Amino acid sequence: MSDIFNDKNAKKKAEQDDKLKELHSKWTREQEFLLAEWAEKASCYRWLHGRAEKKYRKANYSFTIPVIIMSTLTGTANFAMDSFVPEEHKKTAMAAVGGVNILAGIISTLQNFLRYAELMESHRASGIAWSKLNRDICIELALDPPRRKPARDFLNICRAEYDRLIEQSPMI
């Protein structure tokens, strides 16, 4: 008798589990609207991080290019000083070359302190990650509902990724 009772309970439990799985895999309009909103926000964050990357790239180049030019010129000047600078002007030329070297060092130190290259790269990586989230959501929503991943599973994945990106992305 208890075996029959256990079989009935097991069947009932299996039916309830199947209904619950079906309920969790069904897509509702609210879920689609929520995901569409997340996709739109992801697209906005991608754009904002792209703008920040461009800003930091420009700032990084404004430090890097002058340092490269000054270092190249002072290196060449040091090498050519004996050949082209008359003896009476050598001290002045050496002081000028040394001053330019010091200026290049100061600019390089400021560049390292301001971390423009790191900020540029972190915004680039964040923009790519936000773009990926947007693309994943848009692709899933473009599919017919029966061909999509289970709704609850996909929402949980997207929520976790959205939260991770919010926490790990650099400030804009």
Predicted regions and their residues:
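Conserved non-transmembrane functional hotspots
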Residues: 2-69, 80, 93, 99, ...
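Short, surface-exposed helix-loop/turn micro-motifs enriched in polar/charged residues
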Residues: 64, 87-88
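Juxtamembrane "helix exit" motif at the C-terminal ends of alpha-helical transmembrane segments
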Residues: 70-87
